[in-house]
């Protein structure tokens, strides 16, 4: 059985130190094959926050697939926002904005959906979608094929439609056409699992999973406890479990 830990929106700068320690401990206990972080490593894209995020990642198992979120782009420094939007992310976290992991059973491809022209929105470009296709197209149908973005392809009830990643319709059809099985994201600080059938009509009746992680460590929770996802793959079975922390004393337990 293969294990993927999916966490998001750790937001160093507002991260709860006690919960952060619990996350590190639990993920190391799980000993996953891959750790996925779907963006918003910082609160305000400050160097000190990126340094804290780097130290956090260094304590987690490898390999890791890490993509930026909108909070990892400077907000108030307009010069940096437009001309050096991901310089600090690339310096402290990774300079690979299309992180990819492929072995004999799992393929995971991440892309950056954060943009300078929006405060919180994001989009996936045609070029990025073609890159994902190039990585997934010729892989075995028996493999689990995962795409990672910060902005989600679908939403829980009651959320702003603007939070759906831009160009989602085009991208999800192109990716599904080459076998995309699972779409991982964050952004809303709310856990959610949907199938693509909720929003999209894919060709040949194909259905994929859209999975969002809540915030793992940020003090700014939105109606649910700190959490992250554990994805277990034993072909053809896929199990998704949310681990949540209702109190520091309880630690992270299955929801």
Locations of regions flagged by a protein language model:
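A general structural motif
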Residues: 1, 32, 61, 140-144, ...
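Active-site environment of divalent metal-dependent phosphoester hydrolases
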Residues: 13-16, 43-48, 70-81, 116-120, ...
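Extended active-site neighborhood of metal-dependent phosphoesterases/phosphodiesterases
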Residues: 51-131, 139, 173-176, 203, ...
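Short acidic, glycine-rich surface-loop motifs adjacent to enzyme active sites
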Residues: 141-156
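Active-site neighborhood of phospho(di)ester-bond hydrolases with catalytic His/Asp-centered motifs
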Residues: 7-8, 35-40, 64-70, 112, ...
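A short C-terminal boundary segment appended to hydrolase-like catalytic domains
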Residues: 232-255
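N-terminal active-site segment of His-dependent metallophosphoesterases
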Residues: 1-59, 75-76, 131
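Conserved beta-sheet core of the metallophosphoesterase superfamily
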Residues: 160-236
């Amino acid at each position: 059985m293969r294990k993927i830990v999916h966490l998001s929106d750790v937001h160093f700068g507002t991260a709860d130190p006690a919960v952060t320690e619990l996350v590190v401990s639990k993920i190391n206990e799980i000993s996953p094959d891959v750790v996925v972080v779907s963006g918003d490593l910082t609160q305000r894209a400050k160097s000190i926050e990126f340094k804290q995020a780097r130290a956090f990642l260094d304590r987690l198992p490898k390999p890791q697939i890490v993509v930026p979120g909108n909070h990892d782009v400077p907000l108030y420094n307009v010069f940096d926002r437009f001309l050096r939007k991901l310089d600090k992310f690339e310096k402290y976290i990774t300079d690979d904005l299309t992180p990819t992991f492929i072995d004999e059973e799992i393929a995971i491809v991440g892309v950056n959906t954060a943009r300078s022209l929006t405060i919180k929105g994001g989009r996936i470009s045609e070029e990025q979608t073609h890159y994902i296709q190039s990585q997934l197209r010729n892989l075995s149908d028996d493999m689990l094929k995962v795409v990672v973005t910060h902005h989600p392809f679908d939403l829980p009830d009651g959320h702003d439609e603007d939070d759906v990643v831009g160009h989602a319709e085009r991208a999800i059809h192109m990716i599904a056409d080459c076998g995309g099985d699972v779409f991982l994201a964050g952004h809303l600080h709310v856990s959610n699992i949907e199938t693509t059938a909720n929003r999209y009509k894919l060709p040949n009746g194909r259905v994929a999973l859209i999975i969002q992680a809540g915030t793992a460590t940020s003090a700014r929770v939105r109606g649910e406890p700190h959490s992250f996802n554990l994805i277990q793959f034993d072909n053809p079975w896929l199990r998704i479990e949310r681990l949540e922390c209702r109190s520091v004393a309880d630690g992270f337990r299955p929801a």
